[in-house]
Swiss-Prot record:
EC assignment: 7.1.1.-
Function: NDH-1 shuttles electrons from NADH, via FMN and iron-sulfur (Fe-S) centers, to quinones in the respiratory chain. The immediate electron acceptor for the enzyme in this species is believed to be ubiquinone. Couples the redox reaction to proton translocation (for every two electrons transferred, four hydrogen ions are translocated across the cytoplasmic membrane), and thus conserves the redox energy in a proton gradient.
Family label: Belongs to the complex I 49 kDa subunit family.
Native source species: Methylobacterium radiotolerans (strain ATCC 27329 / DSM 1819 / JCM 2831 / NBRC 15690 / NCIMB 10815 / 0-1)
Gene (name only): nuoD
Name this protein carries in UniProt: NADH-quinone oxidoreductase subunit D
């Protein structure tokens, strides 16, 4: 009998692969069709964000957060603003809190629509992305009408938001909600009930409760395994404790469960949006949209054009910026991808001493090797799609 020396086959997956979701490069070690090892190579989109923030004032550093998870930009700004507000003890007016929560939920819809439909495309369905992008376009227009930008909004500011929402926009967001629920139902029927989609996703990339905790997962990745952990319920920030919504939880911890949870989260987000719209219309929802403390919130532009004092005030805040008391703080939000945290260290000057960004996608990608081991090559794109990775935040 002759001895055969069997050597595993190594291939590159990405960074120009349509299912790589950006600039991911995976070096796969294959034994036939079976994946033996996955080696993610990251850093192709590294821009040194954390270091750049140290050279900018707090107000100038906010736009960097739009460029992390650029699929749902406002959710990242939120964490940074919360960190500054905790350190400086800034009181955020109620109307600003409602607007923030409303746009964070719009961001969640933007992210989940992209993820669920592109993951369906990765396994061979062509219709869902077209439907999903049609709805995303409407939501992008809401972003544009609120902040003037479709993508990099720079709308959340320390102490509140940049400008108020016009009443017509609030009406249009209200009118968007119910028809959107029908689209979610159509997507559910088309994708989640599809036999082929189930065959490709059920029992793939299973994560148990203990494993989810050990890997440091958050967001949908832990909820898919059956842990009802959602920062909006567990550690409510802004006005989330007033909102009524459910936290969907999976039971098998596979890629199919995680996608079903994302579909249900979209319905819950619409519930929160409707409550925000109703509260914004009430008399209690009227009032200022930024902190009334002039040390932190610049005057509105229309006032700046009329008053010399407002112009000086505006100029001072945008050039020198405000000084934040010495200290360190961690602020986290339930971003669409998971727990997005900002660890901010202040030395009492007008610039952050250190700003550590805890990106959920980074923690999820490290488990790629462990999740894919023993699966077939075709399952790699299913697992990758369900991790919901955007490289802006992984590479920072």
């Amino acid at each position: 009998m002759t001895e055969h020396n069997i050597r595993n086959f190594a291939i590159n997956f990405g960074p120009q692969h349509p299912a790589a979701h950006g600039v991911l490069r995976l070096v796969l070690e294959l034994d036939g069709e079976v994946v033996e090892r996955v080696d993610p190579h990251i850093g192709l989109l590294h821009r040194g964000t954390e270091k750049l923030i140290e050279y900018k004032t707090y107000l100038q550093a906010t736009p960097y957060f739009d460029r992390l998870d650029y699929v749902s930009p406002m959710n990242q700004e939120h964490a940074f603003c919360l960190a500054i507000e905790k350190l400086a003890g800034i009181e955020v007016p109620r109307r600003a809190q409602l607007i923030r929560v409303l746009f964070c939920e719009i961001g969640r819809l933007l992210s989940h629509l992209l993820n669920v439909t592109t993951q369906a495309m990765d396994v061979g369905a062509l219709t869902p992305p077209l439907w999903g992008f049609e709805e995303r376009e409407k939501l992008m227009i809401f972003y544009e009408r609120a902040s003037g930008a479709r993508l990099h909004a720079n709308y959340f500011r320390p102490g509140g938001v940049h400008q108020d929402l016009p009443p017509k926009l609030i009406d249009d967001i209200d009118a968007f909600c119910d028809p959107f629920l029908q689209v979610v139902q159509d997507l559910d029927d088309l994708v989640m009930a599809n036999r082929i989609f189930k065959q490709r996703n059920v029992d793939i990339g299973i994560v148990s409760v203990d494993e989810a905790m050990q890997w440091g997962f958050s967001g949908v990745m832990v909820r898919g395994s059956g842990i009802p952990w959602d920062l909006r319920k567990a550690q409510p920030y802004e006005c989330y404790e007033e909102m009524e919504f459910d936290v969907p939880v999976g039971k098998n911890g596979d890629t199919y469960d995680r996608q079903v949870i994302r579909m249900e989260e979209m319905r819950q987000s619409v519930r929160i949006m409707k409550q925000c719209v109703a509260k914004l219309r009430e008399p209690a929802g009227q009032g200022p949209i930024a902190s009334v403390d002039g040390k932190f919130a610049p005057p509105p532009r229309r006032e700046m054009k009329r008053s010399m004092e407002a112009l000086i005030h505006h100029f001072k805040l945008y050039t020198e910026g405000f000084h934040v008391p010495e200290g360190e703080v961690y602020a986290a939000v339930e971003a669409p991808k998971g727990e997005f945290g900002v660890y901010l260290v202040s030395d009492g000057t007008n610039k952050p001493y250190r700003c550590k960004i805890r990106a959920p996608g980074f923690a999820h990608l490290q488990a790629m090797d462990w999740m894919c081991r023993g699966h077939l090559l075709a399952d790699v794109s299913c697992v990758l799609g369900t991790l919901d990775i955007v490289f802006g935040e992984v590479d920072r």
